[in-house]
Amino acid sequence: HAFCTGKYLREVILPRLNKGLENSGRRREDFEISGGGFVVTGADDEAVSKMFEWVRMRVGFYGSTPSYWPVFEQHGWEDLGFKLNDLSKKGQWEQMTNEVSDDIVNEFCAVGRFDQITDKIRRRFAGSVDVIAMPENTPSDLLEEIRQIGRSL
């Protein structure tokens, strides 16, 4: 799921996954991990900024749901989940988005223009996931470049 930070992935999900694989006698190579956050990218800074704001809204929306609060808890953001949940019950959707800081949004995504995103993806996802979802407007040559690094993620 995209509602996942690098810290939550490394400190909670991967250890649990590795224990499950060990208990079942399966190898990590036989299992594919998809996701682990959002990829925020575009041709220029304006496009990146627009997508960043969309992710802010998604984090506010998902974060209002108690099922997703363990991610917040891993960062010490428990109060944010309660606040977002309260705002959702009041139908204050815009205020929910406003409660999510830039720093929090950045924990959930790799951010950069098309000419920067490969490095950002490598830093964010290396050693953690096998497959990531890219925005639909990503140029095909960039997708191929990311596919190549994906083999070494």
Language-model segments: residues:
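Active-site-adjacent structural elements that line small-molecule/cofactor binding pockets in enzymes
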Residues: 1-153
